[in-house]
């Protein structure tokens, strides 16, 4: 069992740009102390390479099934016939069906330790909302989730399971908050940026509430490194390419950062390419601008330097709702800027074809988000020499995404 999280800030070849306040208005940086547990703020700005995982969180990891398996995609290899070996880390075995639980458990623990009785968050496809709902239940907290309206209407099964875990769920934009009312109309698809604004506003409007972010912030990425730290131990050989999908960056970071850190320190993975795969509907790494921008739609949170499409960008509704985000985490953005991470983007049709192929060859129905990584793996397997090795993170299953598969098939 992993007993430390990895913080890539200690090994970055350039200084990570700090959050900053906008030129006008109250301090957003000061706002963080009102919405986040103090331990998480310390982690966000830490330069320490290793952060100890509290025993209570390690126990929770054991309860939900960590470590997760690393598997070889032998069926997919045979179907492709390229002579490339393919491994995948499978986070879908966790109770909520995705990697999101890794940081939800940690954040719920710190919120409880900080005296919170209620937590609030945003969710796109519902994986993060489910993770927060379960983590809150396990640590005795109430949970409120603002779910992008397009997913609230289409991902009804995840909505049901969030409520099963005890959460209150609102479609976003909602009429519950001023941020929601500003964008509200019944046919608005919502965005993660708007949902973040609603969750933060909700936390600020009450007592003993904390906000739990699902991605983008550095401590979220740090908690997810349990994935990559396990994978480094499990991989029988170093890959020529390590691949994961990107929404805000926590899934990609969780799988690749321990490997990237070793490469930066000269301790291994020298030949490995790190490939970040995003949805064509939200191509922040491939088409965005590297600049300071708000991580939420309304501008409640501090500005961070990242690749962004603009905080007012509303991506079109797609099956991979968890990737419908306008920006990427600061550390991931810096690594992309430095050329250490290679970005790719794919249209929905190509991604769903890859998802179906994987289901028919490996027996696992992948989440549409995770299928973006599979799409890239198929292309890489055709381009790399025989005998090459690819490893990717299968961040979640798609058993609760039947609507996406039904529309595609």
Swiss-Prot record:
It is an enzyme of class 4 (lyase). Its cofactor is pyridoxal 5'-phosphate. The modification N6-(pyridoxal phosphate)lysine is found at residue 100. It catalyses: (1S,2R)-1-C-(indol-3-yl)glycerol 3-phosphate + L-serine = D-glyceraldehyde 3-phosphate + L-tryptophan + H2O. It comes from the Archaea. Pfam families: PALP (PF00291). The keyword Protease does not apply. Pathway: Amino-acid biosynthesis; L-tryptophan biosynthesis; L-tryptophan from chorismate: step 5/5. GO terms for cellular component: cytoplasm. Its EC number is 4.2.1.20. GO terms for molecular function: L-serine hydro-lyase (adding indole, L-tryptophan-forming) activity; pyridoxal phosphate binding; tryptophan synthase activity. Coiled coil: none annotated. The keyword Lyase applies. Keywords: Amino-acid biosynthesis, Aromatic amino acid biosynthesis, Lyase, Pyridoxal phosphate, Tryptophan biosynthesis. InterPro entries: Trp_synth_b-like, Trp_synth_b_CS, Trp_synth_beta, Trp_synth_beta/beta-like, TrpB-like_PALP, TrpB-like_PALP_sf. PROSITE patterns: TRP_SYNTHASE_BETA. Belongs to the TrpB family. Tetramer of two alpha and two beta chains. The beta subunit is responsible for the synthesis of L-tryptophan from indole and L-serine. This is Tryptophan synthase beta chain.
